[in-house]
């Protein structure tokens, strides 16, 4: 079975559709059902059988910051695509961003290790890069330690 976190996001929904076309069962971890309509819209770009496809997928509610729930959800999973994450450029959201994007990702990795997951694919975005002007230029010296 394949588990996708963040399957109700833009990229995640496209990934869920593509994975659902394979023969493996797909389980999607979602935080809130209010994004299901957006997932249906993405599926409608690919097929007229949106509801049939939607029903074939196992949708499980949870949060990547809840390690106990993750351990339940990882049961029977072989492959994890970790697409979940928050994007926000406001400093007042920094604690929430860290909790989800850092602690949540650590929880995914630890749960995957605990359940002997065969493959973990982590997806990030350009939002992981800083937009701070002082970080825009980087100067480094390259000092190779050998010819290889």
Where in the sequence are the language-model features?
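NAD(P)H-binding glycine-rich loop region in Rossmannoid oxidoreductase-like domains
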Residues: 44, 50-100
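Short glycine-/acidic-enriched loop or helix-start segments at secondary-structure transitions
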Residues: 14-15, 38, 91-92, 131-133
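Active-site proximal helix/loop that lines the substrate pocket
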Residues: 34, 85-89, 125-128
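SDR active-site strand-loop-helix element
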Residues: 5, 29, 80-84, 120-126
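N-terminal Rossmann NAD(P)H-binding glycine-rich loop of SDR-like oxidoreductase domains
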Residues: 2-24
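Glycine-rich phosphate-binding loop and adjoining beta1-alpha1-beta2 segment
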Residues: 30-52
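Conserved Rossmann-fold NAD(P)-dependent oxidoreductase catalytic core, especially the SDR/UDP-sugar
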Residues: 25, 94, 100-148
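Short, well-ordered alpha-helices that flank and scaffold nucleotide-derived cofactor binding pockets
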Residues: 13, 17-21, 41, 110-114
């Amino acid at each position: 079975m394949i588990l996708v976190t963040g399957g109700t996001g833009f990229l995640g929904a496209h990934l869920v559709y593509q994975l659902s076309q394979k023969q493996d069962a797909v389980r999607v971890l979602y935080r809130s059902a209010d994004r299901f309509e957006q997932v249906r819209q993405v599926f409608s770009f690919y097929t007229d059988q949106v509801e049939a496809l939607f029903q074939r997928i196992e949708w499980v509610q949870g949060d990547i910051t809840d390690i106990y729930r993750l351990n339940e959800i990882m049961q029977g999973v072989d492959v994890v695509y970790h697409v979940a994450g928050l994007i926000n450029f406001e400093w007042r959201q920094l604690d929430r961003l860290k909790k989800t994007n850092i602690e949540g990702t650590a929880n995914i990795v630890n749960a995957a290790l605990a359940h002997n997951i065969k493959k973990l694919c982590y997806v990030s975005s350009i939002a992981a890069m800083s937009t701070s002007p002082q970080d825009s230029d980087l100067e480094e010296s390259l000092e190779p330690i050998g010819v290889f």
